[in-house]
């Protein structure tokens, strides 16, 4: 069995992948934030370095990069890359 996660994409990640959102499957026993990022890096190596400096938001709350949390298929998950401007 697995969970399917909808991941909302923003800024550079959205530009590189070319979509507003993607779907990722993870086994039930591996449905954590660390495993999600690991799988994203594997599927989309072109955003790997951006993911290293991006924030992960689960249900509109930022998750610390060193915090591995359990995620559920009904959670709202977003990848928030750093934004630069001038």
Swiss-Prot record:
Positions bearing Glycyl adenylate: 86
Tell me one GO molecular function of this protein: nucleotide binding
Superkingdom of source: Eukaryota
Q: How is it modified after translation?
A: C-terminal thiocarboxylation occurs in 2 steps, it is first acyl-adenylated (-COAMP) via the hesA/moeB/thiF part of mocs3, then thiocarboxylated (-COSH) via the rhodanese domain of mocs3.
Q: Report the locations given in the UniProt record.
A: Cytoplasm
Summarize the protein's role: Acts as a sulfur carrier required for molybdopterin biosynthesis. Component of the molybdopterin synthase complex that catalyzes the conversion of precursor Z into molybdopterin by mediating the incorporation of 2 sulfur atoms into precursor Z to generate a dithiolene group. In the complex, serves as sulfur donor by being thiocarboxylated (-COSH) at its C-terminus by mocs3. After interaction with mocs2l, the sulfur is then transferred to precursor Z to form molybdopterin.
Family statement: Belongs to the MoaD family. MOCS2A subfamily.
Specify the protein name: Molybdopterin synthase sulfur carrier subunit
Gene name tied to this protein: mocs2s
């Amino acid at each position: 069995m697995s969970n399917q996660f909808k991941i909302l994409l923003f800024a550079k990640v959205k530009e590189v992948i070319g979509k507003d959102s993607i779907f990722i499957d993870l086994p039930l026993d591996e449905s954590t934030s660390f495993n999600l990022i690991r799988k994203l890096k594997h599927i989309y190596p072109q955003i790997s370095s951006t993911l290293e400096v991006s924030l992960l938001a689960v249900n509109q709350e930022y998750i610390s990069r060193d915090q591995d949390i359990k995620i559920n298929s009904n959670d709202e998950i977003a990848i928030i890359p750093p934004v630069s401007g001038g």
